Amino acid sequence: MSFQKVDPAQIESVLSKLTLEEKISLLAGKNFWETQDYPEKGVPPVKTSDGPNGARGATFKGGVTAACFPASSLLAATWDLDAAKHIGEALADETRSKGARVLLAPTVCIHRHPLGGRNFESFSEDPFLAGKLAAQYIKGLQGNGVAATIKHYAANEQETCRFTVNEHITERALREIYLKPFEIAIKESNPLAVMTAYNIVNGTHADSNNFLLRDVLRGEWGWKGLVMSDWGGTNSTADALNAGLDLEMPGPTRWRKVDEVLAVVKSGAVLEETIDERARNVLELLAKLNCFENPTIPEEKAINRPEHQKLIRSVGSQGLVLLKNEGDVLPLRKEILTNKKVALLGFAREALIHGGGSASVNAHYRVTPEEGLRAALGDTVEFEYAKGAHTFRQLPLMSDNVVNLEGQPGWTLDFFADEEPNGEPGSSISSEQPSYIPLFVKESWGSVRASAHFTPTQSGKHYFGMSGLGRSKLLIDGEVIYEQKLNCPDSMGFLLGGVEEPEIQYSFEAGKTYAVEVVSVKPTSKGGLALLDGFIGFRLGFMTEEEHNRDLLSEAVDVAKRSDIAIVFTGHTPDWETEGQDQISFHLPSNGSQDRLVAAVGAANPNTVVVNCTGVAVAMPWLDKVKAVVQAWFPGQEAGNAIADVLTGAVNPSGRLPVSFPRAIEDAPAHGNFPGDYTDGKDNRRHLEVTYKEGVFVGYRHYDLSEANRAKVLFPFGYGLSYTTFTHANHKASATSRNTVEVAVDVTNVGTCAGADVVQVYAGAKLAVPENPVKELVGFAKVHLKPGETKTANITFEVRQLTHFTERSGKWELESGDYEISIGQSVRDITGKVEIGLEAQNYKP
């Protein structure tokens, strides 16, 4: 399936029929997901959808189910270009099933710091690996007829103050690290759309940044397509239009109201020709997607395709990385475990399949690790489960033992125009839960009152947790027991379930009925509310005293002691690792509970295995106390099956780390410069400024600088174990022309089972200079081998990959001399080196 060829005459014909006012209206969304249409003028709409690991459709939470694919950090861990392309192809099917033709993906920003809240959505700390995988993802997506939207252009490496943070990045670091994955993917796969980032880059917001949009994207790279803002990420009228932002999303517009744009056109700040150019790019996207011939937006459907289930399971297992396997405790063979007991601890009954935010998906189903292992090992193995640790960030919503004002299960929500909920409400609804998320709501009320009658089944001093976008209070039998007196300090955290809530206790008597109310008012408008500005919102969590104070750790240790194997499933739920917030700790949540669980179980059972589901590196203070560790990332809806496949040996692990795992957060290259420092602005507000002081020395480029730095790495970039062993021989490299280098190495599987090795090629000057990395990834290949089999891996890379940007000359430059080609199985495990001589080169961007 290919895109329609654009007929310039058709575009100009449609454009000529539109008034200036209508052209302006085309430059902002009609609603949250669709573009503006003018059916009477022959202009159809097009629908967009999140996101990188599943086409969610128009509903942020709930809604029509969709396939949930592995997160991009897992996809990167496969080091498999074909896998990335297949995921893209399948996502195109999913996107169409939601009536959309534009998928808001992939995300290719760099893993600058392990605490980056959105790292899991992106591929790697290495721009070459990220760019290559993104290019194949886009080829798969667009080859199947759906437009890709590469994002977030550029340098969206943190979530803290993401709408306003000013990032100071040298031009060299910007070009070599942060723009490079975009450049590779755009030049190799030509995505139809680019989404700008929220942040400020060197003093100018990305959506109005002439250097990024005009000079580099459309100028140097020659890209022709549609540039859209991130949702709520437009920050100006004239500047963004002139810089090249074609489409403000979502609608209704905040910055492109017709009268306001007409005013800047009349003043000469924006030329009418610029409006035409922006509108033309919108129309060309519609033409490429066949919207003119087929303007209908179909209803959303849930299509649970068996081929997608198989793909998700396969790619999920390929991306799992075996970090430790002492004494070959893995794989867990069925014949060995017959009549044995296996302890399943931690998140064994919860499938951690995705991170939070726009990557959230209402999956068709979720396979838990327990379900996957029971299916794989059968009834001959005895399993025993214990939770082991409290990991909640917020108390679960209060939905048990409550009835609304009509006596039905749930809550009554009354909405009022005024901030005081007096008199008759303007609207009332019934809700299963005491929560109101206003993201897709058109009406902006002054206040909301949630009411229910609660009859506890247990006496005790039970716990509440509450938050609201604006001032809020909790009442029991008319008495205020807690009051939030200010706006929520983190509106995105509220939206995505990551805002910190105080815990309030209240004594209840079993069998007695209590009137529970929450009153929340519209927040005082301020910077930072973004899409939630002017809307009410609240949530109320609850947990009994018995459950809250339960000694889960002792229960888990007892189970581990009486088991032959103990498997601890650790990780991040979507409210701990999410868009909108950077993580609060390098340690697993919450408050050290998971670290204590692993350490205690490791001490109780000598055969302890840890399976960690996070999208990022985490601290592992218990590493020496366990036999095996598997990094499982976020594997998608088949999580439990993919994990079981690797644990039982049905699949030989072949994943390799796309990021470095530091020993401590202080060892991260960006430590001390993340998320930045606050300064007082002229507008009497605090502004976050961050300087990328590490320059080009991101990830392994930093650790490679010295032995002292290398000692700070727990697991290096490119690392991963297998159930078999591979050897390399006959390392060769030669410059076949002035522009290319060919590398070859013989790979042999000397073990007893089939597997896949990832051959990695790094290159750098033999005589390294302090301002340049020692070596950088320039190529890779995944080689599948049967026991005893040998294959030759052939990898070609371009000489210009070795150039560095010189700010003084404004050119990419390569000095003549000897260069070392390092071939290996990780950035640290180099199996052979070959020297080649190269001539000097330089070229303009």
Swiss-Prot record:
Temperature notes for this entry: Optimum temperature is 52 degrees Celsius.
Occurrences of domain PA14 (ranges): 406-557
Biological-process GO terms, alphabetical: cellulose catabolic process; glucan catabolic process
Enzyme Commission number: 3.2.1.21
MF annotations from Gene Ontology: beta-glucosidase activity
PROSITE patterns in the cross-refs: GLYCOSYL_HYDROL_F3, PA14
pH effect on activity, per entry: Optimum pH is 5.5.
Cell cycle is among the record's keywords: no
Catalytic reaction annotation: Hydrolysis of terminal, non-reducing beta-D-glucosyl residues with release of beta-D-glucose
Positions glycosylated per UniProt: 202, 235, 591, 612, 794
Residues of the active site: 230
A matching Pfam family: Fn3-like
Keyword Membrane: no
Keywords (A to Z) from UniProt: Carbohydrate metabolism, Cellulose degradation, Glycoprotein, Glycosidase, Hydrolase, Polysaccharide degradation
Record SUPFAM superfamilies: (Trans)glycosidases, Beta-D-glucan exohydrolase, C-terminal domain
Pathway linked to the protein: Glycan metabolism; cellulose degradation
Family under the similarity heading: Belongs to the glycosyl hydrolase 3 family.
Function summary: Beta-glucosidases are one of a number of cellulolytic enzymes involved in the degradation of cellulosic biomass. Catalyzes the last step releasing glucose from the inhibitory cellobiose.
Name of the protein in question: Beta-glucosidase B
Name of the encoding gene: bglB
